[in-house]
Structures are given as structure tokens and as C-alpha cells.
Amino acid sequence: MKESETGRIEVSPGAIASLVSQVVLECYGVVDMASKDLATDLIERLPFDNRRRGVDVHIGDDQIVIDLYVVIEYGTRIITVAQNIQSTAKYYVEKALGVPVAAVNIHVQDLRISAD
């Protein structure tokens, strides 16, 4: 991902997904992360570390593409929440890694009334 004088620095897609998941869950209007399909949902319910749920990271030639599967709070303006998620995720990944984010694709999987 990055070359330095002493060698190459690689950050795994899983590490990036953990960062993005934490940042997205703090965004206004996001209730939860979601699975992209039923098979993935069943796997993610197993008792493993679930911090990467709802995040797919694709690392290409010096750029990153992120797909996010989210549950949005019912009654919020979906497009505004989605745009906020995009800009927030892009900012934090670029700040942490110094690598451009080519796209942050938002997939709204459900709407839910938050527990607050």
C-alpha cells in the first residue's frame, strides 16, 4: 500500500473495515450495520469478532473502494444520512492511511426505529 525507506507498509482490508465500521456507527441516523445477503448474515451471526459486519473493502492500485451495508433510523432523511456516511468514511480512511478512497457505496438494507 505504501513504500517507505525501510520497506513496504500493508494494511489489511479487515483492518480498514474495522475502522470504517466504528466510524459509520457513530454517524447520525445510523442504527446498525447490516449484512449484504442472507448467507453472509448467517455467517456473521457465528460467535466471532463482528466489527467488520456490513463493510466490504476493495484495495486496488493506490485506491480503495468501500461498500457499506447499513440500517438507517426511520424518519431520517435517507439521502442526507447516506451522504454524511460517505464523506465521514472517506475522510477517516484517507486521514488514517494517506491513500485516496475512490468510492464509498452505501447500501441501505433496512430502516428501523432506534432504541433511544
Please describe what each predicted stretch is.
Residues M1-I78, Q83, K95, V99-D116:
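Contiguous, often N-terminal, cationic amphipathic patches that form binding interfaces
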